[in-house]
A protein has these predicted regions:
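Active-site-proximal alpha-helix that buttresses catalytic centers in soluble enzyme cores
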Residues: 2-67, 116
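Phosphate-handling substructures
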Residues: 63-121
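Short linear sequence motifs
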Residues: 1, 12-13, 41-42, 73-76, ...
Length: 122
């Protein structure tokens, strides 16, 4: 069996260096256009899966068109809770962020999850 993992197209969140995982933000139109333009370079598969988030659905569509696929919410990225859509600069001096960043594997983001719980879920 061969498994190929692809990350979704670029988002405003990635461009602005924001923490986001659970936020259902779209991929940028220019990113989707570039993916579509270069789709022939990406491997084809017998089965396709997405996390169900908009950016993953858009990326699949840009690369492969209307292929049948399965949405697996367990593939969603880490839920950063109260840190979602915020930057390091916004968070760095807060006690909650400092508590979390000391051990991201085990410490839980406020109203979010730890890296360990995300890995277990995935």
């Amino acid at each position: 069996m061969k498994l190929t993992l692809l990350r979704h197209g670029e988002t405003d969140g990635s461009r602005r260096d924001l923490y986001y995982g659970a936020a259902d933000i779209p991929a940028l139109p220019e990113s989707l256009a570039a993916l579509h333009e270069n789709a022939a370079a990406y491997p084809r598969a017998k089965r396709y899966y997405t996390s169900g988030l908009l950016r993953t659905e858009q990326t699949l569509q840009a690369l492969y068109g209307d292929v049948p696929h399965v949405q697996l919410p367990g593939l969603q990225e880490m839920n950063f809770g109260d840190f979602e859509m915020k930057s390091y600069q916004e968070l760095k001096d807060t006690a909650a962020y400092q508590a979390w960043i000391t051990d991201v594997e085990h410490n839980v983001c406020p109203n979010g999850e730890s890296a360990k719980s995300e890995a277990k879920r995935s």
